[in-house]
């Protein structure tokens, strides 16, 4: 199948990668797995075995008029430990490589169907200036909404020039993730990056 490039030429790509049916369930699984993998999961509380103090009986068993107590570490005490103390946990979800790649193929196919994939021969700016990046995108007709630039290799000028623009992301073909692709209204990708993606997902 052929994809139109902004310079007017056509780029031949694999229909096995860019002509798939949209599998919403699989894409959802990939997005959830990616977001879950980014969770820190560092919450931790002290149990009654870990709080300080409480080594001795606070007062004698009988004769004080107060309720009997053996330790001040118990959960009903103000400085006591937590009953079921939280522990750091791993939120990451396992997703098979085959399923993940199928989800990415599904996303790229849907981007192409919805005319949200803009293929350019190359995308460079002379200096790391926000103005130049915005002008380059405007020249391509990508002016509004959430935009994502994808190149085959890291371009320092593009990176520095784009990071101050609201709703504009920048990735290389090797660092693409399902969330940034799904969220983008327009994905501007270079021919070289598209070929790298095709090779990866073939």
Briefly describe each language-model feature range.
Residues 1-40, 85-202:
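Extended polybasic, low-complexity segments that bind anionic RNA or targeting/receptor surfaces
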Residues 26-62:
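A short, flexible low-complexity segment enriched in Lys/Arg and Gly/Pro that occurs
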Residues 48-84:
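Glycine/serine-rich anion-binding loops at beta->alpha junctions
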């Amino acid at each position: 199948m052929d994809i139109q490039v902004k310079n007017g030429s056509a780029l031949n790509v694999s229909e096995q990668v860019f002509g798939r049916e949209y599998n919403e369930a699989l894409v959802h699984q990939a997005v959830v797995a990616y977001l879950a993998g980014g969770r820190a999961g560092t919450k931790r509380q002290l149990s009654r075995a870990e709080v300080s103090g409480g080594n001795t009986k606070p007062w004698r068993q009988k004769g004080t008029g107060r309720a009997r107590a053996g330790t001040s570490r118990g959960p009903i005490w103000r400085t006591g430990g937590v009953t079921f103390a939280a522990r750091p946990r791993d939120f990451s979800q396992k997703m098979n490589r085959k399923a993940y790649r199928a989800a990415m193929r599904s996303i790229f196919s849907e981007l192409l169907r919805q005319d949200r994939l803009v293929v350019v021969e190359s995308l460079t700016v002379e200096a790391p200036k926000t103005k130049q990046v915005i002008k380059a995108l405007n020249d391509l007709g990508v002016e509004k909404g959430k935009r994502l630039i994808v190149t085959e290799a890291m371009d320092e000028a593009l990176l520095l020039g784009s990071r101050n623009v609201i709703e504009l992301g920048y990735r290389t073909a090797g660092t693409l993730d399902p969330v940034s692709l799904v969220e983008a209204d327009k994905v501007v990708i270079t021919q070289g990056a598209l070929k790298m993606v095709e090779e990866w997902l073939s």
